[in-house]
């Protein structure tokens, strides 16, 4: 008499097994996200240390060796970049003026593009940081009492700042994130002479870092312009 075969029962994944798989996937995604954030933070730190600080050092060496600010007259100095014309000193003009005085430049995007630096934003898209020098007539400085007044100052302009990079540089230079006060300011806030409220209001940069859970990675991350007040 033939013995009937027992059919093996086909069973799917149990709830516990599926839960374990989902947890593992979530951990992998989280690790990748954290790794990406750590990498961008390290890149921003490198930009602050090598590129931004490198240009500050180059500027200070220029003024120390020449006895005047860039593209000003050493024999009849005005104390203002480009002689106070209001025009920015950028790109080839900036590079040539520095090299003509024997000033070593920081490594930038490439040879001949030392005033530019390419980096990736939170979307992985390329952004370009660009440095120029100029004189402004309306840098806000403390005046009598609790008022503020516009003063002429030489500044270094940084174009192409994402919120993440602007915050990193602001923290490194001023020790806090503040778009209005300190040496490093946003171009739309540097000349604000309105009185401080009580209690003082926060002064965030106009763009904030994107929220990972809500922003669209297909969108372009906006950039800003920052002004750094020079020592001379």
Report the location of each language-model feature:
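N-terminal single-pass transmembrane signal-anchor helix
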Residues: 2, 7-40
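Short, flexible helix-coil linker/hinge segments at the edges of structured domains or between repeats
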Residues: 6-7, 49, 53, 72-77
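Membrane-proximal N-terminal amphipathic helix
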Residues: 37-70
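Extracytoplasmic/periplasmic, Sec-exported soluble proteins
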Residues: 47, 51, 86-90, 157, ...
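Short, glycine/small-hydrophobic-rich surface segments
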Residues: 62-99
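Intrinsically disordered, low-complexity regions enriched in Pro/Ser/Thr/Gly and acidic residues
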Residues: 92-222
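Short, low-complexity, Pro/Ser/Thr/Gly-rich segments in the mature regions of secreted, periplasmic
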Residues: 218-232
